[in-house]
């Protein structure tokens, strides 16, 4: 597009020079030719303006920071004796071509286990009419085996019933044809075997077990992310103070 714009500007310059030279010559060009040249120059300027405006829109889109929030709640179909997990999953993407980052802040896991691993994935549908069971399979727009699905976030370590984690460089996106907006994030009861379980379920969902809690990803402003970032920095400072 930039090359096309340069060519147009060059043509306008050449046309202007030709006209100027013809004005100084003996014969020159007739009035009709001059009017035709003026019209062509005007059309070229209009096209150039449109191109510049489109380039400006593209730059604005590339620079637009996107945010999303997912408010996790226990599955409506979950038996009462199961963990009641709640919390927030926040997303930030600096631009459509940037890698996604996410902040996970969940609680309600069994505290008596002290530490455990739980899988978290993006599922295809944002349908919670039957709790987390109606969110469908893993979101897999490219038809690849698990754990290469764009929303395969992997395993998260839970300590004392709490999960607090920040991850960067995630393969999924808030923009484009494979956006996860409107889709579900699901917290599982078990650990993801990362496709190494040796059965069909392993390459579909990692044998991650029951769906404990879920939410639907929706657009948001930056306030929740900024608040979470401040809290994360505060926790890091407190942790550093304890170790010194």
Swiss-Prot record:
Annotated gene: Sod3
Keyword Membrane: no
GO cellular component: extracellular space; Golgi apparatus
Protein name listed in UniProt: Extracellular superoxide dismutase [Cu-Zn]
CDD domains tied to this protein: Cu-Zn_Superoxide_Dismutase
GO biological process: blood vessel diameter maintenance; removal of superoxide radicals; response to copper ion; response to hypoxia; response to oxidative stress
Disulfide bridge partners, by residue number: 70-215, 132-214
Compartments in which it is found: Secreted, Extracellular space; Golgi apparatus, trans-Golgi network
Uppermost EC category: oxidoreductase
GO molecular function: copper ion binding; molecular adaptor activity; superoxide dismutase activity
UniProt-listed PANTHER family: SUPEROXIDE DISMUTASE CU-ZN -RELATED
Chain ranges passing through the membrane: none
Coiled-coil region list: none
Cofactor notes: Binds 1 copper ion per subunit. Binds 1 zinc ion per subunit.
